[in-house]
């Protein structure tokens, strides 16, 4: 795969659906590409849920959706709590610290709160990359985030353009793409990914990978649906571990040079095959997610060590 033209959508879908191409063979192809660009290094990321449950959006996968009656709700946390998270991240060899807020988008006051905090964090931990995930932002807010030292902005496409309206109706696919493009225009590294397992087709999955290639996302988190009771997709079955591996491998082959991260839902979907995912992915979230728990940090560190890989610090 290294010495050929980039895959077309048609080729990628054929490979993804092929019953003749063994998943482990596909994973080996992806590993060749991953090793070429990233060696055996694994980037670590950590999330802080800085504002929870206060949201008017109706995303079908989300436990913080406006549709959810029972959910954890709190306003934007104090600056000291965000700074404490940065200290924990540094102590645990985390390379990127992600500050996440619920809601359609931040107020100017909330952006100022985040910016002041990031400026302080950067003085103490200049090597720690800061990723903000605040929703749909305005141009002037993006400029403030950049000036404060935010390195990366996460805004996931989540699904294909074709399937988008099955997932959420309170904002458009174009809203999401425009947010990613605005961050790029303001020299903030774009992080954008997907959630697989929401009832989308194989064609949708391949379309997601190509859409992320088209917007040139630097970092691509691949989430697998962890069904939450009461949400639109709460009754769906988990994906099989083997399908998850095929998805991760295809995202690597379609986006060979990008940081591919196994993210939310990896523990319950990949199960015992989690270590194999790092043959294609080169990045993971460590610790808990927004409202679902992750596995203990020690298990992730042991997994990396047992594979003969090393933390990219």
Curated annotation (Swiss-Prot):
<feature type="binding site">
    <location>
        <position position="55"/>
    </location>
    <ligand>
        <name>[4Fe-4S] cluster</name>
    </ligand>
</feature>
<keyword id="KW-0411">Iron-sulfur</keyword>
<dbReference type="GO" id="GO:0009102">
    <property type="term" value="P:biotin biosynthetic process"/>
</dbReference>
<feature type="binding site">
    <location>
        <position position="59"/>
    </location>
    <ligand>
        <name>[4Fe-4S] cluster</name>
    </ligand>
</feature>
<keyword id="KW-0949">S-adenosyl-L-methionine</keyword>
<protein>
    <recommendedName>
        <fullName>Biotin synthase</fullName>
        <ecNumber>2.8.1.6</ecNumber>
    </recommendedName>
</protein>
<dbReference type="Pfam" id="PF04055">
    <property type="entry name" value="Radical_SAM"/>
</dbReference>
<keyword id="KW-0004">4Fe-4S</keyword>
<dbReference type="GO" id="GO:0004076">
    <property type="term" value="F:biotin synthase activity"/>
</dbReference>
<comment type="subunit">
    <text>Homodimer.</text>
</comment>
<keyword id="KW-0808">Transferase</keyword>
<feature type="binding site">
    <location>
        <position position="261"/>
    </location>
    <ligand>
        <name>[2Fe-2S] cluster</name>
    </ligand>
</feature>
<keyword id="KW-0001">2Fe-2S</keyword>
<feature type="binding site">
    <location>
        <position position="131"/>
    </location>
    <ligand>
        <name>[2Fe-2S] cluster</name>
    </ligand>
</feature>
<dbReference type="InterPro" id="IPR010722">
    <property type="entry name" value="BATS_dom"/>
</dbReference>
<dbReference type="GO" id="GO:0005506">
    <property type="term" value="F:iron ion binding"/>
</dbReference>
<dbReference type="InterPro" id="IPR006638">
    <property type="entry name" value="Elp3/MiaA/NifB-like_rSAM"/>
</dbReference>
<keyword id="KW-0408">Iron</keyword>
<dbReference type="InterPro" id="IPR013785">
    <property type="entry name" value="Aldolase_TIM"/>
</dbReference>
<comment type="similarity">
    <text>Belongs to the radical SAM superfamily. Biotin synthase family.</text>
</comment>
<feature type="binding site">
    <location>
        <position position="98"/>
    </location>
    <ligand>
        <name>[2Fe-2S] cluster</name>
    </ligand>
</feature>
<dbReference type="GO" id="GO:0051539">
    <property type="term" value="F:4 iron, 4 sulfur cluster binding"/>
</dbReference>
<keyword id="KW-0093">Biotin biosynthesis</keyword>
<dbReference type="InterPro" id="IPR007197">
    <property type="entry name" value="rSAM"/>
</dbReference>
<dbReference type="GO" id="GO:0051537">
    <property type="term" value="F:2 iron, 2 sulfur cluster binding"/>
</dbReference>
<feature type="binding site">
    <location>
        <position position="191"/>
    </location>
    <ligand>
        <name>[2Fe-2S] cluster</name>
    </ligand>
</feature>
<feature type="binding site">
    <location>
        <position position="62"/>
    </location>
    <ligand>
        <name>[4Fe-4S] cluster</name>
    </ligand>
</feature>
<dbReference type="Pfam" id="PF06968">
    <property type="entry name" value="BATS"/>
</dbReference>
<dbReference type="InterPro" id="IPR024177">
    <property type="entry name" value="Biotin_synthase"/>
</dbReference>
<comment type="pathway">
    <text>Cofactor biosynthesis; biotin biosynthesis; biotin from 7,8-diaminononanoate: step 2/2.</text>
</comment>
<dbReference type="InterPro" id="IPR002684">
    <property type="entry name" value="Biotin_synth/BioAB"/>
</dbReference>
<feature type="domain" description="Radical SAM core">
    <location>
        <begin position="37"/>
        <end position="263"/>
    </location>
</feature>
<keyword id="KW-0479">Metal-binding</keyword>
<comment type="function">
    <text>Catalyzes the conversion of dethiobiotin (DTB) to biotin by the insertion of a sulfur atom into dethiobiotin via a radical-based mechanism.</text>
</comment>
């Amino acid at each position: 795969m290294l010495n050929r033209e980039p895959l077309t959508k048609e080729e990628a879908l054929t490979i993804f659906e092929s019953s003749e191409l063994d998943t482990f063979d596909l994973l080996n192809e992806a590993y060749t590409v991953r090793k070429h660009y990233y060696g055996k290094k694994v980037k670590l990321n950590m999330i802080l849920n800085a504002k929870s449950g206060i949201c008017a959006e109706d995303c079908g996968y989300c436990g913080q959706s406006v549709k959810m009656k029972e959910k954890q709700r709190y306003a934007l946390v104090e600056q000291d709590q965000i700074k404490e998270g940065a200290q924990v991240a540094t102590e645990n060899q985390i390379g990127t610290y992600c500050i996440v807020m619920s809601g359609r988008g931040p107020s100017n006051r909330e952006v100022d709160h985040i910016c002041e905090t990031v400026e302080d964090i950067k003085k103490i931990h200049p090597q720690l990359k800061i990723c903000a995930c605040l929703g749909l932002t305005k141009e002037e807010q993006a400029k403030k985030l950049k000036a404060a030292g935010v390195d990366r902005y996460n805004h996931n496409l989540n699904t294909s353009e074709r399937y988008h309206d099955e997932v959420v109706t309170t904002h458009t696919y174009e809203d999401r793409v425009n947010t990613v493009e605005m961050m790029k225009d303001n020299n903030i590294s774009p992080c954008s990914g997907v959630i697989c397992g929401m009832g989308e087709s194989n064609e949708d999955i391949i379309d997601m990978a190509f859409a992320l290639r088209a917007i040139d996302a630097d970092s691509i988190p691949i989430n697998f649906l962890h069904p939450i009771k009461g949400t639109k997709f709460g009754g769906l079955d988990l994906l099989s571990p083997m399908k998850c591996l095929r998805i991760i491998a295809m995202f690597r082959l379609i986006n060979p040079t990008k940081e591919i991260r196994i993210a939310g839902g990896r523990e319950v979907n990949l199960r015992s095959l989690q270590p194999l995912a790092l043959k294609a992915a080169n990045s993971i979230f460590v610790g808990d997610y927004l409202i679902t728990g992750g596995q203990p940090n020690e298990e992730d560190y042991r997994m990396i060590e047992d594979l003969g890989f090393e933390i990219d610090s």
